[in-house]
Every structure is written in structure tokens, then in C-alpha cells.
Amino acid sequence: MLDENKMKRINELAQKKKATGLTDQEGKEQTLLRKEYLQSFRQSFKKTIENTTVIDPEGNDVTPDKVKEIQKLNNIRK
């Protein structure tokens, strides 16, 4: 994930946008920070999904086939 300073800056810019609006430079900064945040979030979420195994109440592995294939490619699953 993003470091704490970047997260604070994203929130500062969001609050300023609501209160008084942003300059062009601040708007560009906000866009870049949001893109960086989304990229980091998606990467983290993808890793979480790739390392997840789904087990039903009977104890059967019901992990989606697409996830199983990715796990095999990454040597997570045999």
C-alpha cells in the first residue's frame, strides 16, 4: 500500500476540493496520487485472491478454476 504521507495528502486534497476547490496543479497531483493508490490497492487485492482457497461447509475445495490455475502458475497449488 501507499505510505502514510501519500494517504494523508490524498485526504487533504479531497477535503480541500470540497471546501474551496483545487488549483490545476493540485488537481493533477490528486489524479496521480489516486492512480497510484488504485494500482497499489488492486495489486494487493489480486495477491490476496491468488492466495485464497475456498472451502464449502462439507470441506470440499470450491476455489474457482481460474484462481486455481493462477495458483498453479505461481507454485502455490500443486
UniProtKB/Swiss-Prot annotation:
Subcellular location: Cytoplasm
Gene Ontology annotations for the cellular component aspect, listed alphabetically: cytoplasm
Any single Pfam family the record assigns to this protein: DUF896
Keywords: Cytoplasm
Xref: HAMAP family: UPF0291
Protein family (similarity comment): Belongs to the UPF0291 family.
Protein's name in the database: UPF0291 protein MCCL_0996
Taxonomic lineage: Bacteria, Bacillati, Bacillota, Bacilli, Bacillales
